[in-house]
Design a protein with these regions (language model features):
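Short helix-initiation/N-cap motifs at beta->coil->alpha
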Residues: 69-79, 83-100, 113, 191-219, ...
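A conserved helix-loop-strand patch within extracytoplasmic ligand-binding domains
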Residues: 114, 126, 132-215, 219, ...
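Secondary-structure end/capping motifs
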Residues: 272-350
């Protein structure tokens, strides 16, 4: 009778457990830390997507990489055979949406624009830029049948046109807008957000950070737009515009070359609690950036696979973007240039309002983990 009761209890326990998820035999096999990673979904964040799509390559070659759990959503970050974190990738939107999501506690680490991150930090949010992602990749696009063919032609048209040129931009703190305004100022071309001033030669039109400028181009509500890739390549591919200038080449001469665009940012709480896993993540991004630099064809293929844009779009987009994951002297100088530029337009109204460029860079950036990650990879012969 006792034996029968034991059998019944075992069967009951088995039945009760039928709906339970399978548990790993070794509790240590589960990643100890969950990091929620916010991203936008376009090719400025290609380092993350290459890391995800080519995870097995990195694990085989370098002993560190991402193992897919759920495609495009969940990955285990492995280093030397040990799971150091589980990454949950969340598409949070561009412009100010990424730092806004971080401020609400929805993500721990975010990929997005340097200036939106800095603007939130200026307002008191405990955010730090911990790693570059890329530079450049911003363009001036005009209507396909516009007589404007280059920057000199744009300047001439702005000065001589019967009415102000209408140029779209995606967000007040968008990198492309800040560069474009700087170039207009250098050329002494009056611009404004409306045409109420008779001296205005360029009217800036906000088409929204999550909207495409293409509908406005199609109905000719704007004469052109300034924007980052791959939106530019999409417009050209659809026959709704032509590139007349890369913003890196605009005046003042040399000022915008290799300008910082997107970065990796994190909360100070995340950095304090999870420095090891974050450093491991940065190692993966450093290695994937190196692969992008070495194999552009692979980079284009990965971009198309992740973003779902056609190969033609990514073939036009990727070569115009500078992928960089280390804070080089050029990148640091570019951050100081941003500090000067945003001071001119009074973008900062909080703790950076009166900061010098060096004070701004020193406070908004915490690059210790990135530099440590790069040093460890080089010591192991994995990073050139």
């Amino acid at each position: 009778m006792k034996r029968a009761r034991t059998v019944v209890l075992l069967v009951a326990a088995a039945v009760a457990g039928c709906g339970e998820p399978e548990r790993p035999a070794d509790a240590n096999s589960r990643p100890p830390v969950l990091l929620r990673i916010g991203h936008v979904g376009h090719d400025h964040h290609l380092a993350l997507y290459v890391a995800a799509l080519e995870g097995e390559r990195f694990l085989k070659d370098g002993g560190i990489g991402l193992k897919e759990v759920k495609a495009k959503e969940v990955y285990d970050l492995l280093e030397d055979g040990r799971a150091v974190a589980r990454l949950r990738l969340l598409k949070v939107g561009g412009g100010s949406r990424m730092p806004a999501a971080m401020s609400r506690g929805e993500i721990d680490v975010g990929l997005g624009g340097t200036m939106p991150v800095a603007k939130f930090a200026d307002g008191g949010q405990p955010f730090k830029i911990i790693c570059p992602l890329q530079t450049d990749g911003d363009m001036l696009v005009m209507q396909k049948d516009s007589p404007v063919a280059d920057w000199a032609g744009f300047v001439a048209a702005a000065r001589s046109a019967d009415k102000p040129l209408r140029i779209g931009y995606k967000a007040p703190v968008a990198v492309a807008k800040l560069v474009f305004e700087g170039a207009l100022k250098a050329e002494r071309i009056p611009y404004a957000l409306d045409a109420s001033d008779g001296d205005t030669r360029v009217v800036l039109v906000n088409f929204g950070s999550e909207k495409s400028p293409l509908p406005m181009m199609e109905i000719r509500a704007i004469d052109g737009f300034v924007m980052n890739q791959p939106g530019v390549a999409v417009a050209v591919d659809k026959g709704l515009g032509k590139v007349v200038a890369e913003l890196r080449d605009l005046p003042p001469r040399g000022k915008w070359v290799n300008h910082p665009c997107c970065c990796v940012a994190a909360t100070t709480d995340t950095l304090a609690k999870h420095a090891g896993p974050v450093k491991a993540l940065l190692k993966v991004l450093l290695l994937s950036t190196q692969l992008i630099q070495q194999d552009q064809a692979l980079a284009i293929s990965c971009a198309s696979r992740w973003t779902k844009y056609g190969l033609a779009v990514e073939k036009a987009s990727i070569p115009t973007i500078g992928y960089v994951a280390e804070p080089t002297d050029t990148w640091m100088a570019g951050m100081a240039t941003w500090a000067e530029r945003v001071r001119e337009v009074k973008l900062f109204t909080g703790k950076y309002a009166d900061a010098s460029p060096q004070q701004f860079v020193d406070d908004v950036c915490d690059l210790a983990l990135c530099r440590a990650a790069a040093a460890e990879l080089r010591a192991a012969g994995k990073l050139k």
